[in-house]
A protein has these predicted regions:
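N-terminal signal-anchor transmembrane alpha helix
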Residues: 7-33
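Interfacial segments of alpha-helical transmembrane regions
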Residues: 10-18, 84-97, 154-166
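C-terminal ends of transmembrane alpha-helices
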Residues: 26-36, 40, 100-115, 170-188
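Interfacial helix-start motif at the membrane-water boundary
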Residues: 48-71
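Transmembrane alpha-helix entry/boundary detector in multi-pass membrane proteins
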Residues: 57-62, 88-91, 116-133, 195
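Internal transmembrane alpha-helix with an interfacial aromatic "cap," most often the third helix
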Residues: 64-93, 136-150
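Membrane-proximal helix-loop-helix units in multi-pass membrane proteins
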Residues: 101-152
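Terminal transmembrane helical module of multi-pass membrane proteins
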Residues: 142-215
């Protein structure tokens, strides 16, 4: 019988959990306090930057959410790098792309709903798309078969199922975004906000599953 695999890097695991947990708490807070301003069905998470919290903007809080998730992901990246497993470089590059994309999304706002596309808005959209593709790709590379005593092997099936769900959600969100561009916001048929929140939930669950062996 194989002995249980030791924790890869408890310090990185705790930092990752802290960052991811903070991001989740902030996202719940934004949903609760801005439910009357931003539709969770039709509007994306990024549009919380235009919400109002009392006399102030919700943009700083949204930025902190993105930065916290990015920090947690960087900690996961560092923990995986410490494992020194085959394929680590590719996984770290993809997680780096995911983390950088989150950073850009937190600093560069999306275009307001119904307004003309701006360069900043396009940068935000491209960063978000790249990030959401990079994370499940990293998960698939991390759980590639043929790696003996890999800390992530016991969770391989779960990680891959979540990564598949993430890719599927990205496809739906991207398809809905293209339809909205073609038909216009007034004729929007796909509930982008709802599917993006599903994608966010899947990706957070995926991150937490990937973090577990670090602890």
């Amino acid at each position: 019988m194989n002995e249980p695999l030791p924790a890869v890097s408890p310090v990185h695991g705790r930092i990752a959990l802290g960052g991811i947990g903070l991001a989740v708490v902030i996202s719940i807070d934004l949903h609760l306090r801005l439910s009357g301003q931003v539709s969770p069905i039709w509007q994306t998470l990024s549009e919380y930057v235009y919400g109002r919290l009392g006399n102030g903007s919700a943009a700083p809080l949204f930025s902190v959410m993105c930065l916290a998730l990015s920090l947690g992901s960087v900690a996961l990246l560092a923990g995986i790098a410490k494992a020194h497993r085959p394929g680590t470089t590719a996984v770290c590059v993809l997680l780096g792309v995911w983390s950088a994309g989150l950073l850009v999304c937190g600093l560069v706002p999306v275009d307001p709903d119904g307004q003309a596309r701006s360069l900043a808005g396009q940068v935000h959209n491209l960063a978000a798309l790249t990030a959401f593709v990079a994370l499940p790709a990293a998960a698939f590379v991390l759980t590639k078969k043929g790696r003996e005593r890999c800390p992530w092997e016991p969770r391989r099936t779960t990680i891959r199922r979540l990564a598949t769900a993430s890719f599927a959600s990205v496809g739906v969100v991207l398809g809905g975004f293209v339809l909205t561009l073609l038909l216009g916001p007034a004729n929007q048929e796909v509930t982008l906000g709802l599917f993006e929140r599903l994608l966010f939930t899947v990706d957070v669950t995926l991150l937490l599953t990937m973090v577990r062996p670090l602890r």
